[in-house]
Amino acid sequence: MSEVKGLLVMDVDSTLVQEEVIDLLGEEAGVGREVAEITERAMRGELDFRQALNERVATLKGLPDSIFEKVYARIHFNKGAKELVDELHSRGFKVGLVSGGFHETVDRLAKEAGIDYVKANHLEVIDGFLTGKVYGEIVTKDVKVAKLKDWAAENGLKLSQTIAMGDGANDLPMIKTAGIGIAFCAKPIVRVQAPYQITEPDLYKVIEILDEVGK
């Protein structure tokens, strides 16, 4: 097996993809505005992420699980997403996703883009309907850091050989932990503290930063 040279771990909503998937689910449930407002406050760091997630998921109670198919059709990769993954793979990197979103959509995105690792939340479904609850470990800012460290260790990498990228307050600890931390079209709280920034929605810009740093 060839040696792994590095690892990129990134957020999904408003980073890998253009949309916030939970906001799309909220729209389908008829509570789009309320859900989007909570999302915005959580991403700015004004709300505890766990609390914000539970509040938003509760509004989805009673939706049929067929909703994921409908919502998936409305999701768009950000420019350069697949090209970035392909280029990193050609350089011997692994790529992982850590998302406060849901496996029901994130797993499909990962498969479509050829991504190696995924950690996301699970929505509880009983008899084909959402219960308004999540189950299992909730992907918080601390879990994002833990997965960055776990996947690095699994591949015999030092943290200096890792890249982390995201847009929201819950991505900041991960961004600060990685060798290269990137704010992607991020909220002000993230832009101010991240070592590197991408200000236009083009994920391939990661390669420019990587080359500039000379890793």
Swiss-Prot record:
Reaction catalyzed: O-phospho-L-serine + H2O = L-serine + phosphate; O-phospho-D-serine + H2O = D-serine + phosphate
GO cellular component, one term: cytoplasm
Active-site residues per Swiss-Prot or TrEMBL entry: D11 (nucleophile), D13 (proton donor)
Residues annotated to bind Mg(2+): D11, D13, D167
InterPro entries: HAD-like_SerB, HAD-like_sf, HAD_sf, PSP
Cofactor(s) this protein cannot do without: Mg(2+)
Functional pathway: Amino-acid biosynthesis; L-serine biosynthesis; L-serine from 3-phospho-D-glycerate: step 3/3
Enzyme Commission numbers on file: 3.1.3.3
GO terms under biological process: L-serine biosynthetic process
Chain positions recorded as substrate binding sites: E20, R56, S99, G100, K144, N170
This protein's UniProt keywords: Amino-acid biosynthesis, Hydrolase, Magnesium, Metal-binding, Serine biosynthesis
GO molecular-function terms, A-Z: L-phosphoserine phosphatase activity; magnesium ion binding
Family according to the record: Belongs to the HAD-like hydrolase superfamily. SerB family.
NCBIfam families cross-referenced by the UniProt entry: HAD-SF-IB, serB
The protein's name in its UniProt record: Phosphoserine phosphatase
Species whose genome carries this gene: Streptococcus thermophilus (strain ATCC BAA-250 / LMG 18311)
Gene that this polypeptide is encoded by: serB
